[in-house]
């Protein structure tokens, strides 16, 4: 059973007297910086010259500096730019200023696990990975709650890296909900597999193909969208709230019977075999190599596929329906 830590296991005082540099001010960077600041931690945000986020961060009461300067003055350097941009930012702005005994933190293990970033052995390396988007990390903190986090130590040069990691997790509110001990390998491989086979790749194809089957059979696209896409959130919310059993208890008996009798016909043994292949490609680095090469080639296949998916009928119909819904209009205000 994996070890769980809560606020009682974390000492926020460990970060007092240390300066934390948050490199990047996107979804996670924004949340981490503000939560740490509100927790009494000395924070500086590191950005590139001319960043659109510079004024925003300053307006929210944060000190901002060029990334290299932020890394130079900090004891803990937190790299929260996108995975594909991390190597360049690390090499140009962080590595020259990462002296012995400093701490380097990641929120995802990709570049460490796949050897794209290799810190010196005299640097502490750890991960705190909130299991939720940045806006949720921030809103939950403001409500006195928190988003669960994963924590791992990759290098412990000074012998107290886990203490610093747990203090950081507490500082962003994660220890209120629970901090699960893991490894860089486990976090990276399970995260990538979950995204590809279930949460993103699996679910989007399931919704899209379900929509296509109904439309090709002559049903109205709007009805197909509601049944195969829109209602997904309603089902997932029930699962998140109380598990699969809670969802099945909440739906009709007819729906539950259909779940049991048809589910295995859709997700077959062949599907499971393919999912195992996907996992193997994550484990042996095939996916990572392909993604790294795609980025080095300026993303031709990725960009083409993104454009194609955006023009799919399910997206066109979905936008039209959302524009008609009062709750959707309200959420955009």
UniProtKB/Swiss-Prot annotation:
Pathway it belongs to? Answer: Amino-acid biosynthesis; L-isoleucine biosynthesis; L-isoleucine from 2-oxobutanoate: step 2/4; Amino-acid biosynthesis; L-valine biosynthesis; L-valine from pyruvate: step 2/4
One Gene Ontology term of the molecular function aspect: ketol-acid reductoisomerase activity
Q: Which GO terms describe its biological process?
A: isoleucine biosynthetic process; L-valine biosynthetic process
- Reaction equation(s) it catalyzes: (2R)-2,3-dihydroxy-3-methylbutanoate + NADP(+) = (2S)-2-acetolactate + NADPH + H(+); (2R,3R)-2,3-dihydroxy-3-methylpentanoate + NADP(+) = (S)-2-ethyl-2-hydroxy-3-oxobutanoate + NADPH + H(+)
Assigned keywords, A-Z: Amino-acid biosynthesis, Branched-chain amino acid biosynthesis, Magnesium, Metal-binding, NADP, Oxidoreductase
User: Mind telling me which GO cellular component terms the entry cites?
Assistant: cytosol
Where along the chain is Mg(2+) 2 bound? 191, 227, 231
Q: Which residues form a coiled coil?
A: none
Q: What class of enzyme is it?
A: oxidoreductase
| SUPFAM superfamilies from the UniProt entry | 6-phosphogluconate dehydrogenase C-terminal domain-like, NAD(P)-binding Rossmann-fold domains
Specify which residues bind NADP(+) according to the UniProt entry for this protein. Answer: 25-28, 51, 53, 83-86, 134
Question: Which residues act catalytically here?
Answer: 108
In which domain of life is the source organism classified? Bacteria
The cofactor required is: Mg(2+)
Q: In what residue span(s) does the KARI N-terminal Rossmann domain sit?
A: 2-182
**How cofactor binds (record note)?**
Binds 2 magnesium ions per subunit.
Q: What does this protein do?
A: Involved in the biosynthesis of branched-chain amino acids (BCAA). Catalyzes an alkyl-migration followed by a ketol-acid reduction of (S)-2-acetolactate (S2AL) to yield (R)-2,3-dihydroxy-isovalerate. In the isomerase reaction, S2AL is rearranged via a Mg-dependent methyl migration to produce 3-hydroxy-3-methyl-2-ketobutyrate (HMKB). In the reductase reaction, this 2-ketoacid undergoes a metal-dependent reduction by NADPH to yield (R)-2,3-dihydroxy-isovalerate.
Protein name (Swiss-Prot/TrEMBL): Ketol-acid reductoisomerase (NADP(+))
Q: Which organism is it from?
A: Alkaliphilus metalliredigens (strain QYMF)
């Amino acid at each position: 059973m994996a070890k769980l830590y809560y606020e009682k296991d974390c000492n926020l005082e460990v970060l007092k007297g240390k300066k934390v540099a948050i490199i990047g001010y996107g979804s996670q960077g924004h949340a981490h910086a503000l939560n740490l600041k509100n927790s009494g931690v000395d924070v500086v945000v590191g950005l590139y010259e001319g960043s659109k986020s510079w004024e925003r961060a300053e307006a929210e009461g944060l000190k901002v500096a060029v990334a290299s300067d932020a890394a130079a003055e900090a004891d803990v350097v937190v790299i929260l730019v996108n995975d594909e941009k991390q190597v360049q930012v690390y090499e140009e702005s962080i590595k020259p200023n990462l002296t012995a005994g400093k701490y380097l933190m990641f929120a995802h293990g990709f570049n460490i696990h796949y050897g794209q970033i290799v810190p010196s052995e005299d640097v502490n390396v750890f991960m705190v990975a909130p299991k939720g988007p940045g806006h949720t990390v921030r809103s939950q903190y403001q409500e006195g709650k928190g988003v669960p986090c994963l924590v791992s130590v990759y290098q412990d040069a000074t012998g107290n890296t886990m203490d610093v990691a747990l203090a950081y997790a507490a500082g962003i509110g994660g220890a209120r909900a629970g901090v699960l001990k893991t490894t860089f390998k486990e976090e990276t491989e399970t995260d990538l597999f979950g995204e590809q086979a279930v949460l993103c790749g699996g679910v989007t194809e399931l919704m899209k193909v379900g929509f296509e089957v109904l439309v090709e059979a002559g049903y109205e696209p709007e009805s197909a969208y509601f049944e195969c896409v829109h209602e997904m959130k309603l089902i997932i919310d029930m699962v998140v709230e109380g598990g699969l059993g809670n969802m099945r208890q909440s739906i009709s008996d007819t729906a539950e019977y259909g779940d049991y009798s048809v589910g295995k016909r859709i997700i077959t043994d062949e599907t499971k075999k393919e999912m195992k292949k996907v996992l193997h490609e994550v484990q042996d680095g095939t996916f990572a190599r392909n993604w790294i090469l795609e980025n080095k080639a300026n993303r031709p296949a990725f960009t083409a596929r993104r454009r194609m998916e955006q023009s799919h009928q399910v997206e066109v119909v979905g936008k039209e329906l959302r524009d008609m819904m009062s709750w959707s209009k309200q959420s955009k205000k």
